[in-house]
């Protein structure tokens, strides 16, 4: 496998991991991508992403009906592999798309908080702005306040689970769908059924105002999935009122793409000019498998999803005017 101009200069044949709690070490191999990224002068924004790290200290868990094999012991090392690469690139920020931590079935609040603090310390090795998206597992055993006070977002986004920011000529909007209903009852301490997921009325009204403010192209981040028309294996993973969110996005005429995690196998869909990229879960399976990526937005508003290792790459063309 040959390294091109956008891969790490440092390569090795293997990924070395230390599964002990709080320990992580990774030697990066040459990542594989299968798309051509335009030169920097033709890009207006670039950012790195990871999703579904599910950091915790517990045995491998197999979930047959999801074809899921969650190898928690390697999550920190795989995250380090991502941040090591991100630190070699010129990025506007990095973002994790939810389910940052997990918990033990017999765990407690303090132990679960330590998982969150540990994975946040690892993520903070990235030398730049870092953002977080709320995922359902982020509220196992801990409260909403526990989560937002133990992760750090830049500036006005700190302490919030939904927010917007502008970087590099692109507006980014983060939504929180970890609500049990549209009235605003948030997940907390495991008091929820993960398939019941909503963007509440108050947040949806805020979202519509954000879509109408400014003139930049927009990328939306969620943990749970919006592509509700893709019936089949993903049915339990959709936001229940996704149709309302998607309608607002389509009416705005500004949204280029929506990125999410949650469905660990990944998915891609496009509807009415908006691209829906569901990224694969980092926790799945043992090294050398890993999944993370970098997104680049071109001056022509093409979105390039540069997948590394086992993650897929996409070229998302903007809708024709």
Regions found by a protein language model. Give the residues of each.
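Active-site glycine-centered loops adjacent to acidic/histidine catalytic or metal-binding residues
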Residues: 52, 98-99, 135-136, 223, ...
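Short active-site segment of divalent metal-dependent hydrolases/proteases
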Residues: 55, 102, 138, 226, ...
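N-terminal active-site segment of His-dependent metallophosphoesterases
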Residues: 27-110
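Residue-level marker for buried hydrophobic side chains located in beta-strands
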Residues: 47-49, 94-96, 132, 220, ...
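Alpha/beta-hydrolase fold active-site loops
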Residues: 45, 92, 162, 170, ...
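Short acidic, glycine-rich surface-loop motifs adjacent to enzyme active sites
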Residues: 214-229
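Extended active-site neighborhood of metal-dependent phosphoesterases/phosphodiesterases
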Residues: 30-41, 65-69, 105-213, 244-255, ...
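N-terminal secretory signal peptides and thylakoid transit peptides that target proteins
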Residues: 1-19
